[in-house]
Amino acid sequence: GLSGRFVRIDQKKYGKILLPLITPYDENEEIDYGKYAELIEYVITNDLCDSLIVTGTTGEASLLTFDERVKLFETAVKASAGRKPVIAGTGCASTKETIALTNKAYDLGIELALIVCPFYNKPTQEGLYLHYKTIAENTKANIMLYNIPIFVGVNLEAETVGRLAAIPNIVGVKDEAGVNPTQVTDFFLATEKVDPNFVVYNGDDIMLLPTIVQGAMGIVSGGAHIFGHEIRAIFEAFEKGENEKAKELFVPMYRFCKT
C-alpha cells in the first residue's frame, strides 16, 4: 500500500527538498558562472534544500545552449563539492540531444537526471514512452521523469508512468500537473506493483500539502531559494502528525505563491 513510503525516503540519497537553481546572468545576458557558484554556496550554507537541480525550468533550461548547460553542471559539481547531491536537468525536445546531455552529466559524476517531457511537439503517450525508453537504454544515469503539461502541452499519463517504471534506471517522477492535484495518487497506483521503490515528487509549491497527504516523497521547489526552512518545517509537522501546524505553516506560503 501507500503507507510506509515516508519512512523509506530518509534512506534515499536525495532527500525531500530538491531545489532547482536559478541561472544568474550578467548585464550582457551572459551566464555568470561565478555568481552561480556563490548561489550554490549560499543555498548549502543555509541548508535550504537536500539536493540541487541544475538547469531545470527555474534555471531557464530551454534558453540555454548545450555547452552552457554542461558548464553549469561542471560549476555545480565543483561548487557543491559533495556536500549535497547534484541532479542534472537534461531534458531537450530531441531524444538524441537528451541522451548526449545526460551522458555528459553522468561523465561529470551526476548520477540522476531530471528529464522533462519533450516540449513543443506534443507527442502521443506511445511517443513519450519510446522517448524515455530510448534514453534509458542509452545511458547509465538514473532518470526521474518530469511531467509539466502547462509547458509541454501533453500530460504524462499514469498508465505511461507505470510502463516506464518497469525500466530499471527510471526511478521516479516529478509531477507538476497543477490541473490535476490528485495525479500523484494515480502515479502511485500505477507504479506500486511494478516498482515499489518508485519515487513521486511534487513539482509545485502551491500543491505541497495536498501532495504530501497523498504520499509524495518530497518537492521540487523553486521557492526553496526563499522559504526552504518553512518547507522543511511543514514536512516535519506532518510526519509528527501535527496536521493543524502543517496547515498553519502552509497557508502563508500558499498565499505568497498565489500572488
Please place each PLM-identified region on the residue numbering:
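Active-site beta->alpha loop and helix N-cap motifs at the rims of alpha/beta catalytic domains
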Residues: 6-155
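Universal eukaryotic N-terminal targeting presequences
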Residues: 1-5
